[in-house]
Structures are given as C-alpha cells and as structure tokens.
C-alpha cells in the first residue's frame, strides 16, 4: 500500500501513520510517500518522488490511498506511466483535479497535470469527501468521481480529513480497505 499526502502535509500528518500501522495486521507493507516542499509544491518534483516510490512496485494487490493534492498528483502519474494496469484499489480522499477558487496558489500545479482518465485502472476506485469540506468543495470531488466513473462517498464532516479537525484515525477508510482485502462487500 502507498499513501500519498497533499499540500502543506507530511508523512507524519493526519491519519497516515495510523493507517500504515493498522495495515500491518493484514500483512500489508505500507509506504507513506514523501513529497518535497509541500508548502510550495512542484509537479515535476512530486512526480519524481512518486515515480521513485511506486515504479516497478505496483501489482494486482497494490492499493494507493491519496489525500487532497496528492490525488491529482497520483492520477497524473498513473495515467501517463507504463505502470501495472490493474491495481487492487485506489482510495481518493478529498480529491479534485481542477483549480480551486480558495487556493489559487495551486492553479499552476493543477494546470500542469494531464490526467488521462481512460488510463486509470483499478479493481476498486473509491472517492471520499466531506459534506462540508472548507478546502475542497464536495462538488469538485463529485466532478472527479464522474471522470473516474464512480460515485463519491459523502461523509458528514466539517473539515478536510486532517489532524487539525480531528482526523488522527480514519476508521471508515480502514474498513473500506479491509473489506476489499477480505473480499467482502464494503459499506459503499
């Protein structure tokens, strides 16, 4: 499993380490991918970091979890690289792939991405959004979900799934992942 963080975050923030620890009991090795300069992200640098961590490591059992700006970054990577064509799961939290009016400093980064949605292949694609996310409006996540031919799972939450709004753990996400690992139907 690979966890991709977002803007102004690090590998130690939010629920990332908690999820990695939880997955050990399922014999899933988890890497939280370090992305450089998160306060002033550069697409080439982030793409290089993802490439370094994921190249030649993806297979039919791979799961990728991405949060916020990490979502469009990993989708950009997966759509253009010759990577394993059908990973097990893609879990996208507060994802978007369009400029956000409240974060114009990210417009250049986002506009440089060239996600080719027809090249995104996973056995399970799950998008999750908070119904009152002050950072990424749920409508942006809904538009992303449409492009991925999936529906957004809407959770009642007044935040961006960050530690500062109470997300040190993320049981709903863990349960969705483990349901897939156990070949059970998820709550979705």
Model-based region annotation:
Residues 41-42, 158-171:
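Catalytic histidine-centered segment of alpha/beta-hydrolase-like enzymes
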Residues 1-60:
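Active-site catalytic motif of lipid deacylating hydrolases and related acyltransferases
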Residues 28-31, 146-162:
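Catalytic histidine neighborhood in serine/cysteine hydrolases
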Residues 166-188:
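Catalytic active-site module of serine/aspartate enzymes centered on a nucleophile-bearing elbow/loop
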Residues 65-74:
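Gly/Ala-rich beta-loop-alpha elbow adjacent to hydrolase catalytic centers
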Residues 134-140:
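Conserved alpha/beta-hydrolase "acid-adjacent" motif
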Residues 6, 35-38, 90-100:
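Active-site nucleophile loop of the alpha/beta-hydrolase fold
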């Amino acid at each position: 499993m690979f966890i991709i963080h977002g803007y102004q975050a690090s590998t130690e923030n939010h629920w990332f380490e908690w999820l990695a620890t939880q997955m050990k009991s399922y014999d899933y090795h988890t890497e939280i991918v370090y992305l450089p300069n998160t306060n002033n992200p550069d697409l080439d640098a982030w793409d290089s970091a993802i490439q370094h961590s994921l190249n030649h490591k993806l297979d039919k059992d791979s799961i990728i979890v991405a949060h916020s700006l990490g979502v469009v970054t990993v989708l950009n990577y997966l759509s253009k690289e010759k990577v394993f064509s059908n990973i097990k799961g893609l879990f996208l939290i507060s994802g978007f792939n369009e400029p956000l009016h409240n974060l114009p400093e990210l417009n250049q980064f986002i506009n440089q991405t060239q996600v080719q949605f027809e090249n995104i292949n996973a056995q399970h694609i799950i998008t999750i959004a908070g119904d009152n996310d002050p950072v990424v409006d749920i409508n942006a996540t809904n538009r992303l979900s449409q492009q991925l031919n999936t529906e957004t799972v809407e959770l009642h939450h007044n935040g961006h799934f960050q530690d500062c709004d109470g997300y040190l753990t993320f049981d709903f996400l863990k349960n969705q992942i483990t349901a897939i690992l156990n070949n059970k139907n998820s709550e979705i």
